[in-house]
Design a protein with these regions (language model features):
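Active-site substrate-binding loop(s) of clan PA
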Residues: 79-128
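Bacterial N-terminal signal peptides
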Residues: 8-16
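Extracellular/periplasmic catalytic domains that process cell-envelope and extracellular macromolecules
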Residues: 41-42, 70-71, 94-96, 141, ...
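Bacterial N-terminal signal peptides that target proteins for export
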Residues: 1-8
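Extracytoplasmic
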Residues: 23, 34-36, 71-75, 117-119, ...
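Catalytic histidine site
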Residues: 21-70, 167-189
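Active-site-proximal beta-strands of protease catalytic cores
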Residues: 45-51, 97-110, 145-152, 156-180
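Gly/Ser-enriched beta-turn/beta-hairpin loop segments
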Residues: 72, 128-146
């Protein structure tokens, strides 16, 4: 019973967030401007999303072709074609199982046709490298790091931010079994 509580809370609270939520947030779109995925913003103002949200090899933000830097795994940094330093994030090497995190989970409102986000608190159940995970979330030559959280995912929430004490640790990457979600973690700078 308790395991479904979080899933139902997201479903129940989402309509309320439509009318009270953010209206000016950026979103990942296709080349025609149609919504594809959510984006996450670090405390220092840098934007991130999931790599699988790209249209081909291009990133469209609010309908405009936008440069990006591919990080390791299923995560990209938006705005420049090379990785920029970002003090508003916590990298994968510092993320641990048991941390309580906030997920700013988002999607597109069918009522307002605007991005809508709600915050849900959850716990990191485990942290994996791609090799340990043995689940296809990235290419073998592009191995990243992932956290497993107890929160259901839905279409369009990929790219939503996951935060620990106000610092971005990664973005929603994949939902499994309607109850758990993999978070693509921000890799340490090289």
């Amino acid at each position: 019973m308790r395991k479904w509580f979080r899933v139902w809370m997201v479903i129940a609270l989402f309509p309320a967030a439509v009318f009270s939520g953010d209206r000016g947030d950026a979103v990942v779109t296709d080349e025609r401007g149609y919504f594809v995925c959510s984006v996450a913003r670090s405390a220092s103002g840098v934007w991130y999303t999931a790599q699988h949200c790209l249209t081909g090899d291009k990133l469209f933000v609010n309908g405009r072709n936008t440069p990006y830097a591919h990080l390791k795994g299923d995560i990209i940094q938006i705005g420049k074609d090379a990785r920029q330093p970002d003090k508003g994030v916590m990298t994968a090497d510092r993320v641990r199982a048991g941390m309580r995190v906030k997920v700013r989970i988002g999607g597109l409102s069918a009522l307002t046709d605007k991005p809508t986000y709600i915050e849900v608190e959850t716990k990191i159940l485990a942290v994996y490298s791609s090799a340990d995970l043995k689940y296809q979330l990235d290419a073998p030559d592009d191995a990243g790091w992932y956290a497993l959280i107890h929160l259901g995912a839905f279409g369009g929430c990929s790219g939503s931010g996951v935060y620990y004490r106000g610092r971005l640790i990664g973005v929603v990457s994949a939902g499994i079994a309607g109850e758990y979600t993999f978070v693509a973690l921000i890799p340490p700078a090289r």
